[in-house]
Each structure stands twice: as structure tokens, then as C-alpha cells.
């Protein structure tokens, strides 16, 4: 909320804001989304709201929340991060368009520790893996069928072709500048690392303070010893920012060619890493 209030006073070149969370319902619950939507709309921002990946315990709550936003703020765009929510919203509001969040666009290539595996594959398999998901004709057909006209994607060199392809298919492509989502899970990474799982539901302070994981050593099982990682290994294991149940990497190998990208997203969660 503080960041939004500052932005409302001095927006610079920013034209819109993205609220909510890609994957953590607890983060969403604690981040004053209704109040921020109201403030952002009042200040003339283009507003997008990420509805997190919906786990079973939160299904009814976030169905209701997504519908509430749509009906109270028809100018706000809902970004869903799982296919179940997209199917539900399209069935409820068949004439409305939606966005696909990073929970939908997340691909094999987004994982920094997979890149050396990817590059070791034969070229035809590399291309197949890089195209998986966002350049898959069946995926694109489903997105169009569900009324999706915009997609959020990570900033990744291996996705350059996907940006252009998605744009050519008629989608608005938004890219998180300098940021790649590395993992998305059900369990909360953040509370696990600070050993505070009993504080689930009252835990947002741990995310806002920021937790950075830096891999410096590895366990040598044969010799029962810890050893420093090599520079080569470190180059493919960059520092990661933990945010609830996702981890993000800043500038692994950002894209150099943004052909087809309509909007660059500046994510405050990684700005200080």
C-alpha cells in the first residue's frame, strides 16, 4: 500500500499497476488488495489483479473474490494463474477478456538449474522444450477459446521467440523486466526458511523484508563434506529471492530482443536484490 501511495503522488513513466500474487493465497489475503484496487482506480491507473493459483482450500474464496472485483470494478483486468480459474471465469463471464499470469506462462526453460541440461540436448529437442507451453498450438487455441488476450511472461533469453510468436497470434505480451520466476510450489518457501510455519496467515512481513538465497557450497556425499561451488556452477545458480511460495531470479539471462513485447513490468520485489 505504501508503494502504491508513493506511485500515486509521482508516477513517472508508469501507466498501470499489478496487484495480488501469482501463487500465494495468504500473501493476497494480507496485501490489502481491495483498498489498493480502489486507490489505483481513483488515481487513473490501468489496474491488473493477479488471482493466485487456487488450491482446494481456497477455491470458493477466490472464485468469489475474482467475481467481486469484476463486478465492482469492470475496468480492472483479472489475471488468472491456473487453467481451472480461467475455465470458471470464462464460463461466468463469456464476453469478458482475461489475462494469463506467470502461473500459466511458466515453462521448463524458466528454471536456472535446468539451462545446462537444456543446452546439452540436441537442437531439435532444445527447440521443442523452448517452445513448450507458449508456442504450443493447442495451448494458444485454448487461451483464445477462454477469452485471454494478454499474457505475463518472465524475462528470459530463451523466450524471445515466444514473445514474438504470441504477439503474432494477437496477444498483448507483458514481460517482467529483469525477472524470472524460477519455482512455483504449494508449500511456503519463505516460512520454511525462517522456521515460522506456525505463523501461516500472519506472515506477510517475512516476504516484504525479503529473503535471498545464495548458493555457495554443495554437499560432497562421497566424502561427507561441504565444498564451495565452482564459478561455472555459480553462473547457472544465481541468487534467488523468496516470495511466499515462489522463488524469483533477477537477470539470469534476460532477453535482448523484445520484439512483440507491448509492456515492461517493473517488479518491486526484485529491485533491491
Model regions and ranges:
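Active-site pocket-lining/capping segments in soluble small-molecule metabolic enzymes
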Residues: 1-36, 45-273
Amino acid at each position: 500500500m505504501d508503494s502504491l501511495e508513493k506511485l500515486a503522488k509521482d508516477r513517472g513513466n508508469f501507466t498501470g499497476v499489478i496487484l495480488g500474487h501469482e501463487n500465494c493465497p495468504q500473501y493476497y489475503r494480507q496485501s490489502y488488495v481491495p483498498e489498493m484496487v480502489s486507490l489505483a482506480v481513483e488515481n487513473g491507473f490501468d489496474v491488473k489483479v493477479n488471482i493466485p493459483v487456487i488450491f482446494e482450500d481456497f477455491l470458493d474464496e477466490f472464485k468469489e473474490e475474482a467475481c467481486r472485483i469484476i463486478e465492482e470494478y469492470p475496468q480492472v483486468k483479472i489475471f488468472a494463474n491456473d487453467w481451472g480459474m480461467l475455465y470458471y471465469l470464462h464460463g461466468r463471464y463469456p464476453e469478458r477478456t482475461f489475462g494469463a499470469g506467470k502461473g500459466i506462462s511458466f515453462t521448463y526453460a524458466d528454471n536456472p538449474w535446468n539451462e545446462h541440461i537444456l543446452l546439452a540436448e540436441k537442437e531439435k529437442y532444445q527447440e521443442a522444450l523452448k517452445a513448450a507451453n507458449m508456442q504450443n498450438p493447442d495451448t494458444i487455441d485454448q487461451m483464445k477459446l477462454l477469452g485471454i488476450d494478454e499474457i505475463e511472461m518472465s524475462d528470459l533469453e530463451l523466450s524471445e521467440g515466444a514473445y514474438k510468436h504470441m504477439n503474432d497470434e494477437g496477444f498483448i505480451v507483458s514481460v517482467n523486466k529483469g525477472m524470472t520466476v524460477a519455482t512455483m510450489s504449494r508449500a511456503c518457501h519463505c516460512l520454511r526458511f525462517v522456521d515460522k510455519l506456525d505463523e501461516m496467515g500472519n506472515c506477510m512481513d517475512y516476504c516484504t523484508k525479503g529473503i535471498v538465497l545464495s548458493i555457495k557450497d554443495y554437499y560432497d556425499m562421497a566424502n561427507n563434506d561441504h565444498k564451495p561451488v565452482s564459478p561455472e556452477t555459480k553462473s547457472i545458480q544465481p541468487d534467488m529471492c523468496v516470495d511466499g511460495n515462489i522463488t524469483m531470479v533477477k537477470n539470469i539471462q534476460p532477453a535482448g530482443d523484445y520484439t512483440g513485447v507491448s509492456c515492461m513490468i517493473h517488479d518491486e520485489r526484485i529491485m533491491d536484490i
